[in-house]
A protein has these predicted regions:
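Short, conserved loop/helix-junction motifs that constitute active-site signature segments
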Residues: 125-127
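Short catalytic micro-motifs in class I SAM-dependent methyltransferases
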Residues: 106-107
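A conserved beta-strand element that flanks and buttresses the S-adenosyl-L-methionine
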Residues: 103
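Class I (Rossmann-like) S-adenosyl-L-methionine-dependent methyltransferase catalytic domain
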Residues: 1-37, 43-95, 111-118, 122, ...
């Protein structure tokens, strides 16, 4: 299990992953997430410094964000977001009951396979009949870590009785070759959003999934 000390070491410098600079990705993410969180009570898992809380969840009625890093939570709280509150905790240890939507954006791939299974069991048990939103890279493994694959996510959803509502591409994977680089550049054109939805899996870096937990 990754520890608070591990993540505090990442957060020695603000925004270590450049999340606050990913405005194009965030716009794509908000197009997916927005209709599901407007006026809702949201539990945000792995909220980090609150960048996505501010850019994605501003239309939610309330947001409760948890992160394992005290440094990240201090910075998130300092944002002063009117609809959000933040707390330091391992999100595997908090209650999932009482929220309309649970969102795990760019965080679940930090869990080990066993921890991911434990998470989905807990989600299915404590969030029955409600909405779950997941986003992350679907490129498999690279030199840094093991991420998701589209097939792996769908298998996990099926195994834990989550019904897929929709999935949408968020951006292109430039390292997938010349064609992917061209595709990524094309996304900046006026009709780029239409092209984004047509990219094959091998050209996609991050994807967002919306599902409903079984009653």
């Amino acid at each position: 299990m990754r520890s608070a000390a591990d993540f505090d070491s990442y957060y020695k410098s603000p925004d270590p992953w450049g999340i606050g600079r990913a405005s194009r990705r965030d716009k794509a993410l908000k197009r997916v997430v927005g209709p599901y969180i407007a006026g809702k009570d949201v539990l945000e898992l792995g909220c980090g410094e609150g960048h996505l809380t501010a850019s994605i969840f501003d239309d939610a009625r309330s947001v409760k964000g948890f992160d394992i890093s005290p440094i990240a939570i201090t910075r998130a709280t300092a944002l002063g977001l009117p609809n959000a509150s933040f707390q330091t905790s391992d999100f595997l240890n908090v209650s999932y009951a009482g929220y309309d939507v649970i969102a795990a954006l760019e965080c679940l791939y930090y869990l080990s396979p066993d921890e991911q299974e434990a998470f989905f069991r807990k989600l299915a048990s404590e969030h029955a009949g409600k909405t779950f939103i997941l986003s992350g890279p679907i490129i498999g493994s690279n030199e840094y870590r093991t991420y998701f694959t589209d097939g792996g996510i769908r298998e996990s959803f099926a195994r834990h009785r989550l019904s897929m509502i929709e999935s949408r591409n968020l951006n292109a994977y430039r390292k997938a070759g010349f064609a992917a680089t061209v595709a990524a550049a094309s996304l900046r054109l006026p009709l780029g959003n239409n092209l984004l939805g047509m990219l094959p899996d091998k050209f996609v870096y991050q994807r967002c999934y919306v599902a409903r937990c079984s009653d």
